[in-house]
């Protein structure tokens, strides 16, 4: 609570990534938002931030394939398709391990995860958060559905660009049952190579996603357009200016900005935050 309250003067805080279920974990000591004990713990953080005059959104997170069976009592991590993450190692509760080939999700499992997002959003509201940010970036589960690099499904959740967007859309629809849409944000990382990502049709995919998000009056769209996390080099990087041409709402830029470059982006009206 002290860590967050010390930063409340920034205006808006986006929490650390917070898992929506036990299945969602892939980092040691990650916080969660799926039971009453966690809700009570987060209340202390939220109250401390509010006491200092700040606002705070909770970032909803599922790691998908970027995990290991050591986190899940021996069960494989899950993903849209059984495609292994090409990485050096993952730090698990039992030490450094090689990544594993994940288990491809069934339709029933997908529906359960969508419900988990909805339940986690309800828990966030119970804890007093001002809103939630759906983490659809950085090679985690939602991003894995969006990109052909990690999604080879042949059903309604794979193949075409609209099908690959479907998972995010259904999560958004579920979260909206618990949280007012103007208190919901989405985070995307079109250019990132982190967690072994990058698809050849990324520009078409993410342009489509943003066009669809225009149908919702989101609190903001959070774009990791900067290249500080590494660029996948599958085409010309998508910039804030590209997103501004498409997205009609409040746009937030992130990743590798300095004070000067951030102010320049805002002054040129490429971003609002």
State what each model feature region is.
Residues 1-273:
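Flavin-dependent oxidoreductase catalytic cores
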């Amino acid at each position: 609570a002290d860590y967050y309250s010390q930063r409340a003067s920034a205006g808006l805080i986006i929490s650390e990534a917070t898992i929506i279920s036990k299945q969602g974990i892939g980092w040691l000591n990650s916080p969660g938002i799926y039971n009453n004990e966690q809700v009570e713990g987060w209340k202390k953080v939220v109250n401390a931030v509010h006491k200092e005059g700040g606002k705070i959104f909770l970032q909803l997170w599922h790691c998908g394939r970027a995990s290991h069976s050591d986190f899940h009592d021996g069960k494989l991590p899950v993903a849209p398709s059984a495609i292994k993450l090409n990485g050096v190692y993952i730090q698990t509760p039992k030490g450094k391990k090689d990544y594993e080939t994940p288990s491809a999700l069934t339709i029933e499992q997908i529906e359960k995860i969508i419900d988990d997002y909805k339940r986690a959003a309800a828990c966030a509201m119970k804890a007093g958060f001002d809103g939630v940010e759906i983490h659809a970036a950085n090679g985690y589960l939602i991003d894995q559905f969006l990109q052909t690099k990690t999604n080879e499904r042949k059903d309604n959740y794979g193949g075409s660009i609209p099908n690959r967007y479907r998972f995010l859309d259904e999560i958004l629809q579920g979260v909206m049952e618990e949280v007012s849409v103007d208190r919901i944000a989405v985070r995307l990382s079109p250019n990132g190579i982190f967690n072994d990502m990058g698809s050849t049709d990324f520009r078409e995919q993410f342009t489509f996603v943003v066009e669809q998000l225009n149908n919702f009056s989101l609190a903001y769209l959070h774009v990791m357009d900067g290249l500080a996390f590494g660029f996948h080099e599958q085409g010309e990087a998508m910039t804030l200016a590209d997103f501004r041409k498409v997205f009609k709402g409040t746009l937030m830029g992130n990743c590798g900005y300095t004070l000067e470059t951030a102010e320049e982006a805002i002054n040129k009206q490429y971003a609002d935050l």
